[in-house]
UniProtKB/Swiss-Prot annotation:
Bias kind Polar residues: ranges: 52-65
Protein name: Sec-independent protein translocase protein TatA
Any one GO molecular-function label of the UniProt entry: protein transmembrane transporter activity
Stretch list, region Disordered: 43-71
Subunit text: The Tat system comprises two distinct complexes: a TatABC complex, containing multiple copies of TatA, TatB and TatC subunits, and a separate TatA complex, containing only TatA subunits. Substrates initially bind to the TatABC complex, which probably triggers association of the separate TatA complex to form the active translocon.
Function: Part of the twin-arginine translocation (Tat) system that transports large folded proteins containing a characteristic twin-arginine motif in their signal peptide across membranes. TatA could form the protein-conducting channel of the Tat system.
HAMAP family listed in its UniProt record: TatA_E
Keywords assigned: Cell inner membrane, Cell membrane, Membrane, Protein transport, Translocation, Transmembrane, Transmembrane helix, Transport
Matches recorded under PANTHER family: SEC-INDEPENDENT PROTEIN TRANSLOCASE PROTEIN TATA
Domain of life: Bacteria
């Protein structure tokens, strides 16, 4: 009695489809999918600038030290 059977889930699915309609549910699922894609893309983009910042900060830190020795 505590767990739901397959029949219970099918009844819930039919009720949700009747209330919201298939078009609205499809649009909602599509929006969630695109939001997840954008989130993963932003995570990948955040990793790239960190690596680039580390390499440029090392090269700029060594650049002025060499210039001061020549003057």
């Amino acid at each position: 009695m505590g767990s739901f059977s397959l029949l219970h889930w099918l009844v819930v699915l039919v009720i949700v489809l009747l209330v919201f309609g298939t078009k609205r549910l499809a649009n909602g699922a599509k929006d969630i999918g695109s939001a997840i894609k954008e989130f993963k893309k932003s995570l990948r983009e955040d990793d790239k600038p960190t690596d680039q910042l580390g390499s440029t900060s090392q090269s700029t830190a060594s650049g002025p030290q060499q210039d001061h020795g020549k003057h």
